[in-house]
From Swiss-Prot:
This is Keratin-associated protein 15-1. Interacts with hair keratins. GO terms for cellular component: cytosol; intermediate filament. Keywords: Keratin.
Length: 150
């Protein structure tokens, strides 16, 4: 039995497809290094809607040991005028084996799909929203387990 979680790319795009850019590349790792911790702060892109600037930023904290749980934290910041309800942000992507995932920030919830270790997992519909100045801040949380490759 061997466990592999090879490197992969993660790209994201802003709401409505205004911008798309690669934001990070995950390094290869194996069970000898239990946890990969990658504190990131990305500005995924910004655009204007009715004169209001929308900014997508992603504090990303990835704990992705090949054996164990994986979690990714995302958030998005948008003007309150842009929504009739708090921002619901998340992303979907595939990690491992060089797969590329694309972010989906917008209404509803997205999930994380992991192919790197042979298992899929999706972000539960867990939101905790609060108002920060003129923006809504709503983190998304995802967890799952890598599978084993025999």
């Amino acid at each position: 039995m061997s466990y592999t979680c090879n490197s992969g790319n993660y790209s994201s795009q802003s709401f409505g497809g205004f911008l798309r850019q690669p934001v990070s590349t995950y390094n290869s790792f194996y069970p000898t290094s239990n946890v990969v911790y990658s504190p990131k702060n990305f500005q995924l892109g910004s655009s204007f809607y009715n004169g209001q600037q929308e900014t997508f930023s992603e504090p990303l904290e990835g704990h992705l040991p090949c054996v164990g749980s994986a979690s990714f934290h995302t958030s998005c910041f948008r003007p309150k005028q842009y929504f009739s309800s708090p921002c619901q942000g998340g992303f979907t992507g595939s990690f491992g084996y060089g797969n590329t995932g694309f972010g989906a920030f917008g209404f509803g919830s997205s999930g994380i799909r992991s192919q790197g270790c042979g298992s899929n997992f999706y972000r539960p519909g867990y939101f905790s929203s609060k108002s920060i100045q003129s923006s809504y801040y709503q983190p998304g949380y995802s967890s799952g387990f890598c599978g084993s490759n025999f």
